[in-house]
Amino acid sequence: MTNSISVIELQQKIDNQEDFMLIDVRESFEREHFNIGGLHISMQTVFDRVNEIPKEKIVVLYCQKGIRSMIVIQRLSERYGYQNLINLQGGMDAWLKMKTQ
């Protein structure tokens, strides 16, 4: 089971300046349209760049809808033993919806 965080909880982490890492697993063209920051490691390159993903701090991964980031988390957990990865529920779609309300 993948750990997840809501957009409201993520906003609170950002506001409280908590120590965590943010990773966008979308493609470059999606990120250019809109992003909330963090390191960009597309789903296609994540295993080539696994050494950039720490195991000693919380890492929140996001994509457009929360599906690709969930898949990446499952694969990283299975292959490399990560236990510190959290999926942003609803991804950028949920983030944009929250910001427009």
Which residues are covered by each model-predicted region?
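Rhodanese-like catalytic fold shared by cysteine-dependent sulfurtransferases
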Residues: M1-M21, V25-V60, K65-Q101
